[in-house]
Amino acid sequence: MRRREFVIIPIGALGGSLLRSLAEPLDRIARVEVANALATLPLRFFTAAEARIVTAACERVFPRDEQGPGATDAGVVVYIDRQLAGPYGRDKYRYTKPPFGPSSAEHGYQGAENPRALYRNGIRQLGAFDTMPVTEQIAALKAIEKTPFFALLRAHTLEGMFCDPVHGGNENLSGWKMVGFPGPLMDYRAHVDAHYGEAWRPAPKSLEQVTGRRFAPWEEERG
């Protein structure tokens, strides 16, 4: 199974042999490597302990393997931390008055808890997730896969893998390089003649690289 297919199926649908194969890549990632990376992160919402748990959970959702980098490599936890630190995290833009209907694929999460609370409560449910063996981590995520927290975690992991780096994730354009996305290129005319007849694909460029401008975090991420 390709990793692109994995991210669109629920954890409960995975068989035992596949779970073992997904466990192997994380076993090869030294935990000290993750700890060292987190030690230098400019966290705005998570505590260091929470960031370790979220990083480990995101890596289970999108693990590093022979096909490419994982959530840890892409700095997904930074993306999530920035989102939760800003107005999105406190539900500034979502209608939050009861009564609340059932959540659905069409309407999304329906409930009183804002994203910050969903994460804080979800992290408590996961316990010492970052120190668990991989098989136990998978079991822990299977136990919560029907919850709003897991739906949010999974969505945020994918967003952090493939967003523009200005938002905090997709470090070194690792997500775009993996899928061959060139970034927000505005015009290909200059390349047509130079590469006519070739199976050519431009190297990915971020919004800042394309425009030559520096961008500050937008209002959603400033808090």
Where are these regions (language model features)?
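Generic, well-ordered alpha-helical scaffold segments in large soluble proteins
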Residues: 9-13, 60, 156
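C-terminal segment of N-terminal export signals and the immediately downstream linker at the start
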Residues: 17-56
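Short, mixed-charge, low-aromatic patches
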Residues: 8, 12-13, 31-38, 81
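N-terminal export signals
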Residues: 5-27, 133
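Mature-region segments of soluble proteins
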Residues: 38-39, 49-56, 67-223
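Short amphipathic alpha-helical interaction patches enriched in hydrophobic/aromatic residues
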Residues: 61, 65-66
